[in-house]
């Protein structure tokens, strides 16, 4: 998205092979735009050769104006990365997190410059999906917030301001939607039936295909993080965790609820993904499948 908007981009990966794979994925996405006539060959060449730098060295970020962190959804990992960014990036550089759920205030507190820290949460795939959540932490400076919205406009996104809360806006809504789908699976439906019904109704994708696209490890990390405070009567499916425990995180690993051939975004149902689904919680809830209304959420997510 940033390349298409005319920005120079520095991409940091952990290892050389991962860096080259990332470059290949970006080139693949841009080649699609080239084939559709959205960009010229000259622009494609400039974006993939001149405007894009791929590195495994954080020092490559020393002169950038804004960094968007998009590492694994784990607070310890996030803090480690922000510590490195804090040490390397120039004074005044904005440090943004693409976190889906985590506390941006806590991330900001791990740096010496909390006023420069903000959440910029994109939705998958980031070069297509329009929504951008601009998550304002307690100490985020007003000019940093303004820059977040300016970036969203430059990227042709619909930017919304969000407060610091679990899942912000989009994922709080999605969580209730996904809970309903999980309860249907516990009651005997398959993920593939649910996805098909929603696509037939007019949705671009069903919730399980969306999970594969975003990465099943994100939801897995969230479920583990919330386990200690979960109500004992809550109906919690175990089949998504079993998929993740097998190392299957969706499109990024080639297998999740669906199986994906190399280079393909379309998958075929993975029957083994639900072979061990559990109905152990069927009798544990007397709610009859009713879900808490979104309006009943106590903590505000808008500012």
Where are these regions (language model features)?
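N-terminal glycine-rich phosphate-binding loop for ADP-containing cofactors
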Residues: 1-303
């Amino acid at each position: 998205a940033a390349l298409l908007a005319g920005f120079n981009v520095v991409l940091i990966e952990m290892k050389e092979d991962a860096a080259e794979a990332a470059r290949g994925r970006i080139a693949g996405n841009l080649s699609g735009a080239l084939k559709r006539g959205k960009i010229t060959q000259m622009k494609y060449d400039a974006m993939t050769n001149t405007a894009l730098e791929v590195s495994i060295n954080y020092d490559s970020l020393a002169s950038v104006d804004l960094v968007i962190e998009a590492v694994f959804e784990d607070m310890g990992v996030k803090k480690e990365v922000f510590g490195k960014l804090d040490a390397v990036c120039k004074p005044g550089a904005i440090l943004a997190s693409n976190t889906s759920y985590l506390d941006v205030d806590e991330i900001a507190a791990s740096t010496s410059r909390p006023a420069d820290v903000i959440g910029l949460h994109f939705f998958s795939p980031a070069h297509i999906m329009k929504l951008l959540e601009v998550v304002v932490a307690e100490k985020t400076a007003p000019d940093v917030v303004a820059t977040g919205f300016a970036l969203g406009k430059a990227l042709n996104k619909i930017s919304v301001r969000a407060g610091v809360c679990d899942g912000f806006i989009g994922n709080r809504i999605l969580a209730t939607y996904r809970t309903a789908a999980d309860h249907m699976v516990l009651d005997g439906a398959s993920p593939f039936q649910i996805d098909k019904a929603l696509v037939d109704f007019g949705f671009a994708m069903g919730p399980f295909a969306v999970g594969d696209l975003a990465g099943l490890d994100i939801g897995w990390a969230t479920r583990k993080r919330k386990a200690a405070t979960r109500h004992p009567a809550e109906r919690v499916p175990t089949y998504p965790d079993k998929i993740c425990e097998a190392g299957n995180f969706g499109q990024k690993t080639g297998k999740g609820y669906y199986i994906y051939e190399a280079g393909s975004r379309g998958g075929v149902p993975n029957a083994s993904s639900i072979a061990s689904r559990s109905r152990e919680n069927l009798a544990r809830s007397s709610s009859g499948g009713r879900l808490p209304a979104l309006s009943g959420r106590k903590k505000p997510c808008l500012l």
